[in-house]
């Protein structure tokens, strides 16, 4: 059990049998009445944000969650196929569970999968990944306006904006949280 005094951003809790992640919290101590904690919680199944208020000192259940190293094998229709590196068991994970992480998964790459009661509910990505540009228009000579960008498609199918000097075949570093170009890799 987790007390409200232990709340922090990123903490995972369980309410009504569903896992939530604390996105934001604030302790309140009004002049009259008991203290309470206001939170914004993200449902880890749907991604929906909800507001929830807890009385100070209230205890909530800690979810049965684990992280496990899993290898992304391939995409099967709308599903992503992941393999457990310990048991070599393969599982199909729906695209809506993987959500935006799907644009950063390369075949054969290992990532941490977030499991709830033995079922994959998300992928923990590193802060940035290195991906190859597979399609982009060539930069036009003399087109050098400051911070000018052009659209590019990466090897995973993700589309982002890159600077004009980036060409097809270049490897670039991409921020996994914002899908922004961070730099060129050698």
From Swiss-Prot:
Q: Tell me the domain of life.
A: Bacteria
Source species of the chain = Maridesulfovibrio salexigens (strain ATCC 14822 / DSM 2638 / NCIMB 8403 / VKM B-1763) (Desulfovibrio salexigens)
This one is known as Elongation factor P
Question: PROSITE patterns from the xrefs?
Answer: EFP
Q: Name one GO biological process term.
A: peptide biosynthetic process
Q: Chief localization class?
A: cytoplasm
Name the Gene3D superfamilies for this protein: 2.30.30.30, Nucleic acid-binding proteins
Q: What does the UniProt record say this protein does? A: Involved in peptide bond synthesis. Stimulates efficient translation and peptide-bond synthesis on native or reconstituted 70S ribosomes in vitro. Probably functions indirectly by altering the affinity of the ribosome for aminoacyl-tRNA, thus increasing their reactivity as acceptors for peptidyl transferase.
Family indicated by similarity: Belongs to the elongation factor P family.
Where found? Cytoplasm
Q: Tell me, what is one Gene Ontology molecular-function annotation carried by this entry?
A: translation elongation factor activity
Q: Which UniProt keywords apply?
A: Cytoplasm, Elongation factor, Protein biosynthesis
Record-linked InterPro entries:
Elong-fact-P_C, NA-bd_OB-fold, Rib_uL2_dom2, Transl_elong_fac_P/YeiP, Transl_elong_KOW-like, Transl_elong_P/YeiP_cen, Transl_elong_P/YeiP_CS, Transl_elongation_fac_P
An example GO CC term for this entry is: cytoplasm
Q: In which pathway does this enzyme or protein participate?
A: Protein biosynthesis; polypeptide chain elongation
